[in-house]
Every structure is written in C-alpha cells, then in structure tokens.
Amino acid sequence: MYSFEDLKVGNSFIEKRKISEKIIKSFAYASRDRNPIHLDEKFAKKTIFKGRIAHGILVASFISSLIGNKFPGPGTIYVSQNLIFKKPVRINDIVTVKVSVKKKIKRKGWCELLTTCLVKNKIVLEGIAVVVPP
C-alpha cells in the first residue's frame, strides 16, 4: 500500500493478466453484457474484428484491480477514469497493465495516474485515473 506521501511522479506498477474463455464468460454473466462479439465466434467472424474480442470494460477492470489491490492499494478511492479503446483484445492475449503516477494534487490529496494496457507491446487501452490514495 502506498500513501499520498509515498507516491512520486513517475512511480509505476506493472502486472500481467491473461484473457481466457472462462474470464470472458464470467464477465458476460456478471455484467449481463452478452453481446455476441464476445461470445459467438460465428457472429464475430462477420464483423470488422474477424473474430471474438474481450469486453473493453473487462480489460479496463484490470486497471481498477491493480489500483485497488496493489498500487496505490487497499483503501484507494477512485474519483474518475477516462479511457480510450485503441485495439481489440482477444482470447489468450496476455495484457500488460501499467499504472504510473502522472501528477500529484497536494491541496486535495489526489493523484492523476496514467493507465495503460498493452498486448504484445502495443497499446490497446489508455486513459487517466484520478484517485485518493490511502
């Protein structure tokens, strides 16, 4: 766990997550997002993606998991998150999740975090989170 005082601009934390069939199905069940682009290969082959893709918000949830569990860690409060989805993520892809301290807002005790997800060193999702560290 990292407090506001512990965090320095440029500090970062990285973890890797694998997209599996089970994770996609579990997310579809929990979120009730059963869009066939995620679940039906026959349907998905006819789309611009030419196959099934993971839910974008599933991939984004890896950022939330890293922030809430590891960096800054338990007790962190999410204030906001913006996201840009740049490329699709597919079953069996290994997602590298990176969170870096971009800016500290001392008067509020907030941090801006650069949030990035990559597959094979290509950015698939990026954005900025604002958090209150524990």
Give the ranges of each region predicted by the language model.
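Generic structural detector for well-ordered beta-strands
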Residues: 14-18, 84, 100, 130-132
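Intrinsic-disorder/low-complexity coil detector
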Residues: 35, 73, 87, 132-133
